[in-house]
C-alpha cells in the first residue's frame, strides 16, 4: 500500500496494495471484515462491514454499506451504496443505490437517480443535464427495475416497480 492518510482503519480490515486511502473510515468486525485491494484510490469515503473494494476502484465522497463489492476499475463519486450492492467496471455519480443494486458492465453510467434491487444492462446511460446548465434533474427507478443493453433514460423520470426499460 502506497499511501494511507487521515484514515480510520478498523481492527479487522485488510489493506493489500491500495494506491491511496485518504480521509476514509473503514468499519469492520471479526465476522465481517473489510478488504481493500490492489490499486484502489479512495478519498473522503466510508466503507462498512463485510465490503470489499478491489482491482483499481476509484471512489470519492461516497458511502459503501454492508457486504458490498466494488471491483474492476469501477468509479464512484458522491454516491451511496447500501447493503449487498455489486458494482464492477462502470461508473456512478450522485447515485443513491439501495440494497442489491447491480452493475457489471464497462459502459454503464448510473447518474443522478435512486435505485433499489436494480440491474443495469450494458451501456445503460442516464442524462440529467441541460446544455451548459449542469445537472438539473434526478429520477427514481423503483424496486426490481432492469434496464436492457443500450438503455438511455432522460431525467426526470420515475420507472415503476419491476419494470424493464429497453
Which residues does each PLM region occupy?
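Glycine-rich hexapeptide-repeat left-handed beta-helix
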Residues: 16-19, 24-61, 65-166
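Active-site pocket-lining segments that scaffold enzyme catalytic pockets across diverse folds
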Residues: 8-9
